[in-house]
Structure formats: structure tokens, C-alpha cells
């Protein structure tokens, strides 16, 4: 049984009750959304995961990516990133490790958080194939599905799988070349496999078998966008749309089998094209939850891509995206460090909150009203408690204090609020 099959059968699970309470929503309404496939609750039956709802009519959620690379392997560092994710309000974590003992790293990450954990299994497949055969492209079907099954048994809650990269998709890419080709790592593995062997993508060819594996453990399928644009010039091209059409067809198959599914979206999109991309996806994929990376709205800001992504993420969430994958200042430059994780997470949470306010979400507005009340009362402690990041503003206030404990050092004696407040008392 999965959350979706239970919902279709009219069964109210404990996870549904928890999410409904968290979202301030009637549980029957939530159950109906899950039954239709408009909301997912990624929770593997083998793990005690905190239930998190992702989809329409819910708060916008934020994911943190972390993980090792062949150039930097430090489990302690990754666990520190997990700690930061827990502390600053991530809704999910993806382990994208490609260096070191991948099962051991994943085990430690899972052990140190109760947040939903996602992976991209093809990374481990590629690492295993390289170790065994010397090349990633020599991976085979057995290796692919063995890794997926092993990760499902370990408790992974959602998996990014690039099932929409097919021989047809690759043909479209070759006939309509783009500036930066394939920038998705998992997408590149499978594109290279198809081109070298002239074989169909096993994840697409054996999709029914894949669904059986995922359904057994109630792993949510996150359909990866292997043809996402890697620069603004490539946005919304034929390869991207061809893959999206295939993903829409696969969403239908998931729903027929009762497998929870969400769809991943583009990474580099000009601001004026974001709304159209969201509406195309929501239409083609019939309101499946949409998971976007950014989108990044300019390619000119390496070192500041947490900002470019937050700008794009706000509009994306207002226009239909349900799940924002954070982007850190290190994007396009190096592996993220602990501080990068915090900066990226807070930036994406700002985008999510701004979007939820724009959509009129009641819980988002309650927080805004609480902050306004605290500021009006000069209650600095309360302001910091409500803030998305309590530590930074508290430290900043201590650095240059005001002589008046109610004011701040910007205005001091000339505080507008205090001035009008004093006049009102006379």
C-alpha cells in the first residue's frame, strides 16, 4: 500500500492526519488531493520519516542538496550540513554523494535526520559501473535496478530518476543542438548510454517494473528533468519540451499503479518565461507536484546564485511550483560548504514565504502579522524568534547597539515608531 492507494480507498493514514494539521487543512480535502495525485507525502515504509506534504494548496516546500564528490569526501562535513538543514527549517534533504563509500554516507545521513531523504540512484550506478567496468556507460539494467531496490530497502523516501530521456528525446536533442547540451549529471549518464549502445533507457523501457519496486516501499518517484536548460539561451527548447511530454505520460502510469509521483523542472529560465514554463508543466503533467531548481534568472552571478535562484523561485512558486530545490552561493563554482548550505536554504525559504504570501496562504500571512505586531511593540526577542534566521539579525543588533533598547542603531533617538508612539501618549 502507498499513501496514494490508501487515499483512493478512502483510508486516512497517520501521515495524512499529521500533514493536514501542519497545513491547517481538512484531512478529507488533503486525502482527495493525494488520491488525484496533486499532493505527495514522501515517506518510505521502512523509515520513521517526518511526514511532509508537497503539492497544490499546501505551503511551498524547500529541499537541501548535499553530498560528497570525488574531490572532497568528508562525512563529518556532510553531517554538519544535515544539522544545518534540520536547524534552519529544510523540508527535505537530497544526498547527491558521488565520492567515497556511498551506502555508508547515505546510512549516516538517514540516521541523523527525520526529514524526507531523496537520492539520485543513477549516481551510485555510475560509480559502481566505473569501479567494476572502468566506464559509467558500461552500466547495465541489473546494476540499475539493484541499486534502486537497495536504496528503497534502506529507507530512501523519494528518488530522482531520469525516465524521460529516451531515444526519441536524444534524437530531438541531436536535431536541434543547444548551446550547452546536457547539464544534468544523471541525464548525461543516460544520454551517453543511449548514444553509445544505441539502446533504450532501461528506466523507460522497464518502467512498469520500476513502479513495482517503488510501490513496494512507497518510494515517491521524482521524475528527473535530464534535458533541463543549462543556460538561458537553451530554455524551453524542443529537447526540454519533448522530455516533459514523456514525463506527462509517465505521470499517468504512476497514478494508475498508485505510485506517488512528482515532476522536476528547469534550472535556467529568463524571468519572463518562468510563468509559461510552470503552466506548461502543470498542464502536461496534470497538476503533479512540481519540483524546480531555482530557476536561475541570469547566468552572470556565480557566487551569488542563491539570489538568482530565489528571484526565480518566488515567481515559479507563485505560478505553480510546489517544491523549491535550494541553490547555494557555490553553485557553478565548487562543492558547497556548511555556510553555503545555510545561505542557500534561507534564500529559498524567503522565496517560498514570499510566494505563499502572494498566493494568500493563511499560515504565511499569520507569520507576517506576528512579525508586524512584534515590530510595533519593539519586541526584539519575538522578532528574532519569528525570523527565518534568528541568529544573524540577533548578532547584527549586538554589533552596533542603540542607546535606546527599544530602537535600533539606524535611527536611535529618531525612531519613527517611537516618535509617533510618544506623541500618542500625550
From Swiss-Prot:
UniProt-listed Pfam families: ThiC_Rad_SAM (PF01964)
Tagged with keyword Ligase: no
Keyword 4Fe-4S: yes
EC number: 4.1.99.17
Residues annotated as transmembrane: none
Annotated metabolic or biological route of this protein: Cofactor biosynthesis; thiamine diphosphate biosynthesis
GO biological process, one term: thiamine biosynthetic process
Molecular-function GO term, any one: 4 iron, 4 sulfur cluster binding
Domain of life: Archaea
Binding site for Zn(2+): 268, 332
Co-factor binding details: Binds 1 [4Fe-4S] cluster per subunit. The cluster is coordinated with 3 cysteines and an exchangeable S-adenosyl-L-methionine.
Catalytic reactions on record: 5-amino-1-(5-phospho-beta-D-ribosyl)imidazole + S-adenosyl-L-methionine = 4-amino-2-methyl-5-(phosphooxymethyl)pyrimidine + CO + 5'-deoxyadenosine + formate + L-methionine + 3 H(+)
Annotated positions binding substrate: 65, 94, 123, 162, 184-186, 225-228, 264, 291
Function: Catalyzes the synthesis of the hydroxymethylpyrimidine phosphate (HMP-P) moiety of thiamine from aminoimidazole ribotide (AIR) in a radical S-adenosyl-L-methionine (SAM)-dependent reaction.
Family: Belongs to the ThiC family.
Protein name as it appears in the record: Phosphomethylpyrimidine synthase
Organism: Methanococcus maripaludis (strain C6 / ATCC BAA-1332)
